Amino acid sequence: MLSVPEMILYEDRVNSFGGWSKQLRPNKDTLAPAGFFYTGMGDKVKCFACGLEVIDWDPTDNPWTEHGKFSGDCLYLKMTGAIVKSKDATTTNPSTSNPFTGANNQQAVIPLTAPPPLFQQPPPPTTTSAPAVDVAPAPPTFGFNTTSTSKTTNYAFPARATAPPPITSVPKPMFGNGFVFNSSPNKQTALFGKPPGNGQDVCGNMPSTTNNSNKQQGVFGINMTGGTNQQQPTSGMFGVKPVVAQPFKF
């Protein structure tokens, strides 16, 4: 876990040396790459990863060497590769190249001149256009006004039923305005009401008004008056007295 994660970026550590004296050596160009940032007090610097604080710098001190001397297990040094596990891999003269002496020293610090890419400022974001992507054809519109089958979705829809043409005129009735006349002179039947005009049928005949012996039968339950051969009315729905016209002769 990092000690001061706010200083993980190299640029932030460099900017922390704003109050660092120009006469002090080493300077920000060598301290910041080694993981140190300035604390603002004297010449004390601190590692952002392990939290090591170092003071009393000499002009000949190497920040990488001093860092590894006091904090060899620093995560930043291990990740940057500044620590070499075998001191035999450094040089044939350990006394001059290896700052560590003694039988227990098994590490040598190799100074670095620049921080690794992992701890540097990330590059600014760039805008790139997305590659063209083939768009699949749109699915068919759901409805009932198509007679074809889609090849992509394999959906079939029934055709919409064709409505009959609108009625523009009504034919006239064959036997007058709502009347049907039987061929028998004694059984005329009125269906809807009075005959057209002044009581004439479609042939122009006037209805009979004489009191003959054979009275016609009313359909709607009303007896015809007069005559000697009175007939009983049939059962009907409405008490309407029909007007009887002469039969239509074919």
UniProtKB/Swiss-Prot annotation:
SUPFAM superfamilies referenced in this protein's UniProt entry, alphabetically: Inhibitor of apoptosis (IAP) repeat
First and last residues of every BIR repeat: 13-78
Residues annotated as transmembrane: none
Name this protein carries in UniProt: Putative apoptosis inhibitor ORF99
Function statement: May act as an apoptosis inhibitor.
Pfam families registered for this protein in UniProt: BIR
InterPro entries found in the cross-reference section: BIR_rpt (IPR001370), IAP (IPR050784)
GO biological process, one term: regulation of cell cycle
Organism: Ostreid herpesvirus 1 (isolate France) (OsHV-1)
PROSITE patterns recorded: BIR_REPEAT_2
